[in-house]
Swiss-Prot record:
Reactions catalysed according to its record: (2R)-2,3-dihydroxy-3-methylbutanoate = 3-methyl-2-oxobutanoate + H2O; (2R,3R)-2,3-dihydroxy-3-methylpentanoate = (S)-3-methyl-2-oxopentanoate + H2O
Sequence similarity: Belongs to the IlvD/Edd family.
Protein name: Dihydroxy-acid dehydratase
Function: Functions in the biosynthesis of branched-chain amino acids. Catalyzes the dehydration of (2R,3R)-2,3-dihydroxy-3-methylpentanoate (2,3-dihydroxy-3-methylvalerate) into 2-oxo-3-methylpentanoate (2-oxo-3-methylvalerate) and of (2R)-2,3-dihydroxy-3-methylbutanoate (2,3-dihydroxyisovalerate) into 2-oxo-3-methylbutanoate (2-oxoisovalerate), the penultimate precursor to L-isoleucine and L-valine, respectively.
Positions with a binding annotation for Mg(2+): D80, D122, K123, E447
């Protein structure tokens, strides 16, 4: 065992003395058992994580019952909703790398034999996965579970995005401040990851398709008693995975990545999942090109539409309809789409995991013969504005905006864009351009939920598009194109756009372009001053110097 490095032999007496002092060692027999890290992300700032302390306790009990010795440790976490719309959002994506580094550090420093990872929200799940793949010790994931949707006294179903969009409605006088307060107080009714197919729930669902989590991980509600049982079952599996030396890199493959992307496309997951899955592939040293997503999308039907793409369906409805296993079972009917032989942490193949699954509500999970669309709910757009690609959540775009041409309204930061939208500078037909908000320019590639919600709230969702080198919340909806690469800070073409330039977005054609010739773009970029970093000290200054492009997952470079 790896942990023998810190516990075996007379020369390790000091190490054993320290281990005994933790209280985790009951008898000397424990030194012959595998040491299992319980990587928890409990904190009291994130509603999706406020309940994880109890799940950690359940996991530790299950590991002991299975014959292991558990050691719980924590990672940090950022609530994207609370960090939204101010300087705090610059730390959100950057926190993913801190989490990956912290997992690597604890596992390697203490020679742990295996890991039970308990994440829940946006950057925590991919961060833990990146760290686990880096160390390549046996691992199993079990999330904290989704929040239930809220309900107003009038019976209207609401979620966090309802609150964000209500701010825009209040600014136009469509609703009163009292009505806004009602939505505010009902939008997030309890613990759990926010209740739509936003980034957190998307990633926790993808864990099932990747093979790293038990069925139910992505959809069983946080407050459902079955969540505690799932934690117990998952933690109970880790000792067997350690004993059989089942490592994450033996589970993650190109095939399992394609399975996860197919699921993502079929349920219209967050655009952030592309960013995170590319980063996960990078840690596993798997080659996956941005452009492959369009090829996969062409044969993946969009069969499960969940908030924010609709206000009628939330994650709890997906769970009731059969969960992720039912979606995968339906997708397995498309010849050659899924690799059902992919291994998983259950000890069975993906095909075996979903063999008994069935769709229990066709209003939530459609058949592949009658999808919402024949192609997936995400797409990569290329063109002279995004030579290296950009991403759009097609499933959340209204039919009238699938093709759009309009004049650019350019803002060099998100705050200016929000002000422009709220004060009426943005008009019907415009294409809002928010730049210098990419991985390096932001820094941290902040999410644009506030401006997209303002656009929707002010009734412009069917007439205004938004493009950015930043990214979007999983809760964003509308004609929102993000991850534009190269970013403005790297002198990408988006830096050449001026207010009034005509921009065409053609989602079915997978293109996005500005009506400028190459020479004009080149001349405008040459005339620009060198990019001046916004933050010059602390973690974000270091992050900005090391981060790579969005089209490769915005991972940190190790080439110096």
């Amino acid at each position: 065992m790896r942990s023998d490095t810190i516990k075996k032999g007379f020369e390790k007496a000091p190490h054993r003395s320290l281990l005994k002092a933790t209280g985790a060692i009951s008898t000397r027999d424990d030194y012959s058992k595998p040491f299992i890290g319980i990587c928890n992300s409990f904190n009291e700032l994130i509603p999706g994580h406020a309940h994880l302390q109890e799940l950690g306790r359940i996991a530790k009990e299950a590991v002991r019952e299975a014959g292991g010795v558990p050691f719980e440790f924590n990672t940090i976490g950022v609530c994207d909703g609370i960090a939204m719309g101010h300087v705090g959002m610059r730390y959100s994506l950057a926190s993913r790398e801190l989490i990956a580094d912290s997992v690597e550090t604890v596992v390697e420093a203490h020679r742990l034999d295996g890991l039970v990872c308990i994440p829940n929200c946006d950057k925590i799940t991919p961060g833990m996965m990146m760290g686990a793949l880096r160390t390549n010790v046996p691992v199993i994931f079990v999330s904290g579970g989704p929040m239930s949707a809220g309900h107003t006294p009038s019976g209207k179903t609401v979620d966090l995005i309802s609150v964000f969009e209500a701010v825009g409605q209040c600014s136009t006088g469509e609703i009163t401040e009292d009505e806004l307060q009602t939505i505010e107080e009902c939008g997030c009714p309890g613990c759990g990851s926010c209740s739509g197919m936003f980034t957190a729930n998307s990633m926790n669902c993808l864990c099932e398709a990747l093979g790293f989590a038990l069925p139910g991980n992505g959809t069983i509600l946080a407050a459902d008693p079955r969540r505690n049982e799932l934690v117990k079952a998952a933690a109970g599996r880790i000792v067997d995975l350690v004993n059989k030396d089942v490592r994450p890199r033996s589970i993650l493959s190109r095939q399992s990545m394609l399975n996860a992307f197919a699921l993502d496309l079929a349920m219209g997951g967050s655009t952030n999942t592309i960013l995170h899955t590319l980063a996960i592939a990078s840690e596993a040293e798997l080659e996956f090109d941005f452009s492959e997503l369009n090829d996969l999308s062409a044969k993946t039907p969009y069969i499960c539409k969940v908030s924010p793409a609709t206000t009628e369906v939330h994650i709890e409805d997906v769970d009731r309809a059969g969960g992720i296993s039912a979606i995968l079972k339906e997708l397995s009917k498309v010849e050659g789409l899924l690799d059902l032989s992919a291994p998983t942490v259950t000890g069975k193949t993906l095909g075996e995991n979903i063999a008994d699954a069935e769709v229990l509500d066709r209003s939530v999970i459609r058949s592949v013969e009658e999808p919402y669309s024949a192609t997936g709910g995400l797409a990569v757009l290329y063109g002279n504005l995004a030579p290296n690609g950009s991403v759009v959540k097609t499933g959340a775009v209204s039919p009238s905006m699938m093709k759009h041409t309009g004049p650019a309204k350019v803002y060099d930061c998100q705050d200016d864009a929000i002000a422009g939208i709220m004060n009426g500078d943005v008009k019907s037909g415009d294409v809002v351009v928010i730049r210098y908000e990419g991985p390096r320019g932001g820094p941290g590639m902040p999410e644009m939920l506030s401006p997209t919600s303002a656009i929707m709230g002010r009734g412009l969702g069917d007439s205004v598009a938004l493009i950015t080198d930043g990214r979007f919340s999983g809760g964003s909806r509308g004609a929102c194109v993000g991850h534009v690469s190269p970013e403005a800070a790297d002198r990408g073409p988006i830096a050449a756009v001026q207010t009034g330039d005509m921009i065409t977005i053609d989602i079915p054609g997978r293109t996005m372009s500005v009506a400028l010739d190459d020479e004009t773009i080149r001349q405008r970029i040459e005339a620009l001053p060198e990019f001046e970093p916004k933050i010059k000290k602390g973690y974000l200054a270091r992050y900005a110097r090391m981060v790579t492009s969005a089209n490769t997952g915005a991972v940190l470079t190790t080439n110096f």
